[in-house]
């Protein structure tokens, strides 16, 4: 959910009045398309935490706090990455790369969003969810962006942990604790992130090379990259099946069928590279979004329907 995340808002505002262009630039800083992952995973996590019997107001408040936290992390990421965003074609139209927003104002905006996220979640949910939001922002900015991203090809493996946190925040907002289903959901997204991101990086590896970012497709052969994509895809699917122990039959069936489909795409990509055939990594990137959405939507439906879990059958 990363491609073209900032170009849409700014593109629509090119002929807008200056005030509106400024608003759109600040919206673009938050990378709205990246925030979609929050919506796709947080609601199902909250529904599973209480088997569908969750106060709708709590869901809305948690989503608002989560959106502010994600927007804060993404904005501060833009501040830290402004130099390489100017080099990469895919990110050259981001607000700081185009000087649509000053670095100082972007930094203030990101910090205010982060403080607001913590305060809102503490006030409307509980302290644990607020602290998890702060930890997510800090990890994404200081560990992933400032340390891992420019130093190791495993950047998205460990840095991807930040994208797993919305399920933890959602679960803790309902239960005020962290239990094993939340950890399994964390694992699903953790293992899903590398194949999702590496598929995109295969398409834009020259961009990353020019910016000096050692993404795996930049420093490794296509065969090695697609092999690791396949390994992490298997780990993703196995994690979704493990989650079936806490969910019901609807989720189990959908997770299995979606997993077969996702694995087929990953195997096809790996096989294509080994046979020297033309490959379409961007297709896997796009379809991985659909896969995650299908699995978590099935989890939400299962939780609301309230059919017996596999433990109860």
Curated annotation (Swiss-Prot):
Keywords: Cell membrane, Heme biosynthesis, Membrane, Transferase, Transmembrane, Transmembrane helix. GO terms for cellular component: plasma membrane. Its EC number is 2.5.1.141. Disulfide bonds: none annotated. GO terms for molecular function: protoheme IX farnesyltransferase activity. It catalyses: heme b + (2E,6E)-farnesyl diphosphate + H2O = Fe(II)-heme o + diphosphate. One of its GO terms (biological process) is heme O biosynthetic process. Converts heme B (protoheme IX) to heme O by substitution of the vinyl group on carbon 2 of heme B porphyrin ring with a hydroxyethyl farnesyl side group. This is Protoheme IX farnesyltransferase. It comes from Mycobacteroides abscessus (strain ATCC 19977 / DSM 44196 / CCUG 20993 / CIP 104536 / JCM 13569 / NCTC 13031 / TMC 1543 / L948).
């Amino acid at each position: 959910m990363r491609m073209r995340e900032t170009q849409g808002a700014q593109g629509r505002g090119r002929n807008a009045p200056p005030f509106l262009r400024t608003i759109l630039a600040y919206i673009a800083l938050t990378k709205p398309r990246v925030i979609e992952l929050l919506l796709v995973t947080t609601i199902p996590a909250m529904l599973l935490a209480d088997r569908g019997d969750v106060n709708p107001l709590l869901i809305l408040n948690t989503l608002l706090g989560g959106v502010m936290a994600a927007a804060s992390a993404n904005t501060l990421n833009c501040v830290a990455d402004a130099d390489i965003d100017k080099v990469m074609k895919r990110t050259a139209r981001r607000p700081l790369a185009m000087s649509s927003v000053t670095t100082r104002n972007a930094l203030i905006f990101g910090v205010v969003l982060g403080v607001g996220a913590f305060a809102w979640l503490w006030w409307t949910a509980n302290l644990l969810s607020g602290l998890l939001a702060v930890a997510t922002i800090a990890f994404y900015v200081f560990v992933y962006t400032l340390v891992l991203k420019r130093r190791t090809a495993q950047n998205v493996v460990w840095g991807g942990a930040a994208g797993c946190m919305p399920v933890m925040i959602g679960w803790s907002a309902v239960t005020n604790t962290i239990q094993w289903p939340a950890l399994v959901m964390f694992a699903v997204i953790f293992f899903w992130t590398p194949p999702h991101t590496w598929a995109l990086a295969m398409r834009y590896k020259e961009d990353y090379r020019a910016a000096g970012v050692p993404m795996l497709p930049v420093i490794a052969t296509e065969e090695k990259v697609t092999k690791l994509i396949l390994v992490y895809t298997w780990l993703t699917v196995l994690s979704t099946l493990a989650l079936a122990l806490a969910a019901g039959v609807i989720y189990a069936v959908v997770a299995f069928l979606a997993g077969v489909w996702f694995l087929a795409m990953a195997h096809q990509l790996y096989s294509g590279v080994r046979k020297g055939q033309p490959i379409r990594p961007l297709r896997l990137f796009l379809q991985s979004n659909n896969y995650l959405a299908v699995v978590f939507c099935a989890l939400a439906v299962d939780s609301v329907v309230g059919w017996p879990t596999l433990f109860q059958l």
